[in-house]
């Protein structure tokens, strides 16, 4: 599972079904006990998304997505992230950056709200990720990254992600590549491949840096 949030929520929703039977969108369809999510990394955005990402025994990586999987509360406590190694901090931060960028340039359900949240997330990640990597005990940087991850998660839950995540999930499932690292490698390649189709939105993001 993508995070400790995903497993108990999915199991509470449909304890008598296999995880594979819940693959896809709106397969849980059952209310679960409201719960609070307390992230210890700034990356997945699980504290505000509908998705539980699963890698099965065949190395196939897929999502179980349902509105009931969204936590009722998110507690963003920077002290819980201070012991995170610099490498994991960087990789999870770049996962959040990819969420924000793909949400911003996507055309699925892109709104003024999702674009605003994505812009805020991108600006914060560029400013505070190097600081958190250099000094993991910097609580201001940790808090800003947690908030950015939350905003990026909120944005992509509405606007969706794109081809970067599609490829990153495949690499992660087949070769156990950390998700944030796969995103970091693929994001610039995919943005270049998009060419003029993404230039206007990417220029808008560049203006916030």
Region locations from a protein language model:
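Glycine/threonine-rich beta-strand-loop-alpha-helix active-site module
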Residues: 1-79
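Glycine-rich phosphate/pyrophosphate-binding beta-alpha loops
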Residues: 43, 150-183
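Carboxylate- and glycine-rich phosphate/diphosphate-binding segment that chelates Mg2+/Mn2+
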Residues: 51-159
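Gly/Pro-rich interdomain helix-loop hinge
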Residues: 174-209
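A general structural signal for well-ordered alpha-helical segments in protein cores
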Residues: 94, 122, 164, 183-184, ...
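Alpha-helix C-terminal capping segments
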Residues: 8-14, 29, 156-160, 170-175, ...
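Buried hydrophobic packing segments
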Residues: 4-11, 100-101, 125-128, 149-153, ...
């Amino acid at each position: 599972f993508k995070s400790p949030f995903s497993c108990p929520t999915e199991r509470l929703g449909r304890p008598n079904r296999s995880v594979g039977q819940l693959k896809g969108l709106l397969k849980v369809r059952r209310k679960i006990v409201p719960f609070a999510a307390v992230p210890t990394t700034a990356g997945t955005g699980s504290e505000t998304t509908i998705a539980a990402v699963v890698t099965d025994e065949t190395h196939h990586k897929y999502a179980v997505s349902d509105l009931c999987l969204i936590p009722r509360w998110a507690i963003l406590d920077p002290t819980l992230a201070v012991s995170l190694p610099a490498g994991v901090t960087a990789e999870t931060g770049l996962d959040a950056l990819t969420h924000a960028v793909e949400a911003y340039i996507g055309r699925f359900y892109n709104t003024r709200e999702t674009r605003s949240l994505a812009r805020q997330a991108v600006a914060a990640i560029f400013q505070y990720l190097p600081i958190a990597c250099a000094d993991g005990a910097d609580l201001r940087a940790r808090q800003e990254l947690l908030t950015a991850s939350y905003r990026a998660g909120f944005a992509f839950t509405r606007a969706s992600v794109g081809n970067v995540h599609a490829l990153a999930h495949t690499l992660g499932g087949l070769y156990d590549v950390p998700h944030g690292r796969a995103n970091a490698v693929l994001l610039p390649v995919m943005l270049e491949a998009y060419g003029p189709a993404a230039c206007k939105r990417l220029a808008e993001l560049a203006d916030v840096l």
